[in-house]
Regions:
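A beta-strand edge to alpha-helix "cap/lid" segment located at domain peripheries
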Residues: 2-22, 71-167
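Short, flexible active-site loop motifs that bind/organize anionic cofactors or intermediates
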Residues: 17, 36, 59
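A solvent-exposed, acidic/Ser-Thr-rich amphipathic alpha-helical stretch
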Residues: 26-29, 43-97
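Short, aromatic-enriched amphipathic alpha-helices that serve as compact interaction elements
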Residues: 23-40
Length: 167
């Protein structure tokens, strides 16, 4: 099933039970929850969204299990400073969700990047992700070309999403 673009976030309402099989509402809520967790930049917190034996492919790196996820994210956020991420539901079916995303960050030399990508997720019966496949491309940008300007942490509900920003 394909997702409808521009779905409004309803973070002020109670979250439905986010387990498969996903509906449009639960898939979109799952995507926003993942975005919020990643924007925390807390590797331990993020890792809890994945099974202890989770399998990832992130670019050309293979990551297996929560311990490796924590180590991977710790390295990532030491390099990718002032990281801000937007995820958008692309498609869903059963226990699978496809997402497109963009994030902005800079390195320790002050060089800014916007990274674009797609993720394919598969969840266990408890709604915990056990497979994550990510393809990512990096685009150098000028600081003046940044589009993600909220304070570090959770993206505000009124901040535009990827489609709204024309990305």
């Amino acid at each position: 099933m394909y997702a409808k673009r521009g779905t409004k976030n309803m973070s002020t309402q109670p979250l439905p039970n986010l387990v498969p099989p996903f509906t449009r509402e639960t898939a979109a809520a799952k995507v926003r929850k993942a975005e919020d967790n990643w924007n925390s930049r807390d590797p331990e917190k993020v890792s809890l969204g994945y099974t202890v034996d989770s399998k990832w492919r992130n670019r050309a790196e293979f990551v297996n299990g929560r311990q490796e996820i924590v180590a991977f994210l710790t390295r990532k956020w030491r390099r990718e400073l002032d990281y801000r991420l937007i995820k958008e539901l692309w498609a869903f079916d059963g226990a699978r969700i496809a997402v497109r995303f963009g994030y902005e960050c800079h390195d320790d030399s002050g060089n800014w990047y916007r990274s674009y990508g797609n993720e394919n997720w598969e969840f266990d019966e408890n709604g915990v992700m056990h497979h994550r496949y990510a393809c990512i491309n990096d685009l150098p940008i000028k600081e003046s070309d940044r589009k993600f300007h909220w304070p570090l942490g959770r993206r505000p509900d009124d901040h535009p999403g990827l489609s709204d920003l024309g990305l």
